[in-house]
Amino acid sequence: MVVAVPDTSRPAAHAIGEMLGAPCREGFIKNRYSGRTFIMPDQATRNAALRLKLNPIREMFEGNRVLLVDDSIVRGSTMKRIVRLLRTLNPAAIHLAIFSPPVKHPCFYGIDMPSEEELIASRMDH
């Protein structure tokens, strides 16, 4: 089953599900009052916001093979916490699909982007 990390990854998740012939399901209840976690000023704030932001629906993950689709991965810390949380629900497998190009360099135009060392894609060989 394909599950989007709400909200901006939904179109890609539906397209991937259609291409694979796999159902695309809503796997999370999202708190609409939380902001984008990757631009928050420090890791403690990002962690607290993520705990409030996404609540997984147990029945969607328990015993299922899941392809988790997200729009981007910046530091990797948000995805790490999501996967850690989902593992407590005993899925058969968790796979990831990130549909944007790798973020390898900081952006200095007003968004709190980390240094190159903090960007997960800058540390990976392709």
Region spans (language model):
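PRPP-associated nucleotide enzymes
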Residues: 1-126
